[in-house]
Regions:
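Compositionally biased terminal segments of proteins
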Residues: 1-157
Length: 157
């Protein structure tokens, strides 16, 4: 995935004042742990006003009326993830309100980092480790182990 496309989305999120945190493979890459990925994973504060700002940001990058199908309550519901597939692109954008009962937007620790002139709200290595260490997916467990080694992370008591 081209970093320029990711930064276009994050620049729009910054411009629209969206409360978000970048997680997933791209966040790992920005922490120096390269992993191939074809999605942009964004934890988004699930309040309706913030979801509307996220939609406005997406509309400013993608000329796609399907963005309007994202409802303000989607990220606060029983299945709090929306997968948006931009037309004519080879990646997807996952908007996440929470991960089950384990991790909510409010639980995330993040740092702000400038990447090619764009302010990025990036999950900390510890947050990424917490998100990935106990999942069933092998790739997530491998990511957790890489984070643990690289940043000297240990499980919390």
């Amino acid at each position: 995935m081209e970093l320029a496309k990711v930064l276009d989305v994050l620049r729009a999120f910054e411009r629209e004042a969206v409360d978000y945190v970048l997680v997933g493979g791209i966040a790992l890459a920005l922490h120096g742990l390269a992993r191939a990925t074809q999605d942009i994973d964004l934890f988004v504060a699930p309040d309706p006003g913030n979801v509307e700002r996220a939609k406005a940001a997406l509309r400013s990058v993608f000329d796609d009326t399907s963005i309007d199908d994202i409802a303000p309550g989607d990220l606060a519901g029983e299945y709090p993830t929306v997968r948006y597939v931009p037309e004519e692109e080879s990646f997807v954008i996952d908007l996440i309100g929470r991960l089950g009962d384990a991790i909510r937007y409010e639980d995330l620790e993040f740092e702000e980092r400038e990447v090619e002139g764009v302010r990025v709200r990036l999950a900390t290595p510890r947050t990424l480790y917490r998100m990935k260490k106990g999942t069933a997916r092998l790739i997530d467990r491998a990511d957790a182990e890489a984070l643990r080694r690289r940043f000297g992370l240990e499980d919390e008591p």
